[in-house]
Swiss-Prot record:
The keyword Translocase does not apply. CDD domains: NT_ClassII-CCAase. Nucleotidyltransferase that catalyzes the addition and repair of the essential 3'-terminal CCA sequence in tRNAs, which is necessary for the attachment of amino acids to the 3' terminus of tRNA molecules, using CTP and ATP as substrates. tRNA 3'-terminal CCA addition is required both for tRNA processing and repair. Also involved in tRNA surveillance by mediating tandem CCA addition to generate a CCACCA at the 3' terminus of unstable tRNAs. While stable tRNAs receive only 3'-terminal CCA, unstable tRNAs are marked with CCACCA and rapidly degraded. GO terms for cellular component: mitochondrial matrix; nucleus. One of its GO terms (molecular function) is RNA binding. It comes from Candida glabrata (strain ATCC 2001 / BCRC 20586 / JCM 3761 / NBRC 0622 / NRRL Y-65 / CBS 138) (Yeast). Its EC number is 2.7.7.72. Keywords: ATP-binding, Cytoplasm, Mitochondrion, Nucleotide-binding, Nucleotidyltransferase, Nucleus, RNA-binding, Transferase, Transit peptide. The lineage of its organism: Eukaryota, Fungi, Dikarya, Ascomycota, Saccharomycotina. It catalyses: a tRNA precursor + 2 CTP + ATP = a tRNA with a 3' CCA end + 3 diphosphate. Belongs to the tRNA nucleotidyltransferase/poly(A) polymerase family. This is CCA tRNA nucleotidyltransferase, mitochondrial. InterPro entries: NT_sf, PolA_pol_head_dom, PolyA_RNA-bd. Pfam families: PolyA_pol, PolyA_pol_RNAbd.
Length: 531
């Protein structure tokens, strides 16, 4: 006879289902009843929605992640049976059976835990069996087997993520006995002792930090204390892929309260393993042996320079936003990648002017700014983000010099500013903010200087707008190459590219210039390039 499940229904509010969720649950209830009628006397099939969906619904938020745990069979077995049921009852539900995407067990990758995915009423649903897990010392990938609801709840990263919605009972189950209370209190607590939980799977540290920053929750004091453990830090570096770290960090950086996430990272001294300057140990070792700047890079971590900068940035960030409304408006109105890239560039200011050898086997052009390497190789973010972040960090000093030059001269040539902005490839605004942040952090102790610095940068910003230079990177010669060759009655050659550079400068300095005036200018300088 099957083992009875101890029910853990507490005074938790009923979940309000959407119309589509109701249809899905009604279908699953019907199929479950059908299955159990055919297997009378055996342990009944029970379905539970698990994870973030339950948490989000109880918080009154929408959720699109439907993960359904099954007690007596694999996800693939269940989905196959459900599809057969849909074939027989198409008239009742109007749902065509979909192909089942099976994700087999794979001990090398934690994301592959024998899950089956299909669609119900145009909603993607994952089915997986209830699991218990056993870890080894050298991997965060557990050995999994069928488990009870209690075992499945206890293996989760936080009690408030271990709440289950029993579909048949239309009720929330709290097998940890703390999940609902912790959700009400806004407390993140591990179901099992935190130290072993984190050693088993250090990614849980970063996940708790992400949930804290997303919901503005507190991490329970004892759990937070364990996050400081150097052994956890080491396990983090040894057990977790850079891609997994990057996924969590991206969610933190584009989330509603990234500064809280960064604060927790700084407090737990995880910045040295999260913002690693390269993810490939062989590249790291090569640089240590062959590249003198490697010591400078690693000293930034070892001597606490990075941690101190991160702490300083976090401490002053809100004050900076309150003083500089342009940045606040940009964060609120631009794509979320803007917030992510601004934060990353500001965090990585200490890495300015430092490079590493990124491609040891390549003889030429094999170096990369450390800031770009951290984003691309350490966090495994996309190439576009890594380039923008590096462009910001590597141009901090140059941008500040341009601001000072403009203020001292009072009347820079329009072409000088335009050419400089062209070099920033359309990213001048974010470079502006990061360079200003660098100056702000340097002079924050002297309040009068801070006001002065913001005023300087504002005046330069206004000059760019007044001179209509904000789209300098998009400027093209008003006479294209083919027409130019025809007008000048000469053959194309290397001179054409050089003339085009001169044309761009002329157009910057003559915003009202006519085509005829430009032709006269080109003819006047052409002999210099045809010699």
């Amino acid at each position: 006879m099957f083992k009875a499940i101890r029910r853990v229904f507490t005074m938790i509010p009923r979940i309000q289902l959407t119309e589509k969720e109701t249809r899905i649950c009604n279908l699953l209830k019907d199929y479950t009843a059908h299955y159990n009628s055919l297997h009378y006397g055996q342990e009944p099939l029970t379905l539970r929605i698990t994870g973030g969906w339950v948490r989000d619904k109880l918080l009154g938020q929408g959720s699109h992640d439907l993960d359904i745990a099954i007690n007596i069979m694999s996800g693939e077995e269940f989905a196959t049976g459900l599809n057969g049921y849909l074939l027989e009852h198409f008239d009742k539900y109007g749902v065509k059976p979909h192909s089942i995407h099976k994700i087999d067990k794979n001990p090398e990758k934690s994301k592959h835990l024998e899950t089956a995915t299909t669609k119900l009423f145009d909603v993607e649903v994952d089915f997986v069996n209830l699991r218990s897990e056993e870890y080894t010392e050298d991997s965060r990938i557990p050995t999994t087997q069928f488990g009870t609801p209690e075992e499945d709840a206890l293996r989760r990263d936080a009690t408030l993520n271990a709440l289950f919605y029993n579909i048949q009972q239309d009720a929330v189950e709290d097998f940890t006995k703390r999940g609902w209370q912790d959700l009400q209190d806004g407390v993140l607590r591990t179901p099992l002792p935190a130290r072993q939980t984190f050693l088993d799977d250090p990614l849980r540290v970063l996940r708790l930090i992400r949930f804290a920053s997303r919901f503005n929750f507190n991490i329970e004091a004892g759990v937070l204390k364990e996050m400081h453990d150097p052994e956890i830090n080491e396990a983090f570096n040894n057990k977790i892929s850079r891609e997994r770290i990057g996924v969590e960090m991206e969610k933190i950086l584009v989330g509603p309260n990234p500064i809280l996430g960064l604060k927790l990272i700084q407090r737990t001294h995880l910045e040295n393993v999260i913002f690693l300057w390269h993810g490939d140990q062989s590249v790291i070792e090569y640089n240590r042996k062959n590249w003198p700047q490697t010591k400078d890079v690693e000293d930034i971590y070892k001597k606490g320079i990075f941690n101190h900068h991160l702490k300083n940035f976090i401490h002053h960030y809100k004050d900076f936003l309150s003083r500089y409304l342009k940045l606040r408006q940009a964060i609120e109105t631009k794509d979320k990648s803007f917030q992510q890239n601004f934060l990353l560039a500001s965090i990585l200011i200490p890495m300015a002017d430092l490079k590493i050898i990124a491609l040891p086997k390549k003889k030429l052009n094999n170096t990369l700014p450390v800031s770009e390497s951290i984003v691309r190789e350490g966090l495994k973010f996309n190439k576009a983000s890594s380039i923008v972040v590096a462009r910001c960090v590597e141009n901090i000093a140059a941008y500040n010099s341009m601001v000072e030059k403009y203020l001292q001269s009072g009347d820079l040539k329009r072409s000088e500013v335009g050419t400089f902005l062209r070099e920033l490839r359309g990213d001048w605004e974010i470079v502006h903010y990061v360079s200003l942040m660098d100056q702000y952090l340097k002079y924050i102790s002297r309040k009068d200087n801070v006001v002065n610095i913001i005023d300087k940068y504002d005046r330069f910003w206004n000059y760019i707008q007044e001179q209509n230079l904000q789209d300098s990177d998009k400027m093209v010669p008003i006479i294209d190459g083919k027409r130019m060759v025809k007008i000048l009655e000469t053959k194309p050659g290397p001179w054409l590219g050089k003339i085009n550079d001169e044309v761009i400068l002329w157009q910057f300095d003559h915003p009202q210039g006519t085509e005829q005036e430009l032709i006269s200018f080109i003819k006047s300088i052409l002999p210099n390039y045809l010699q």
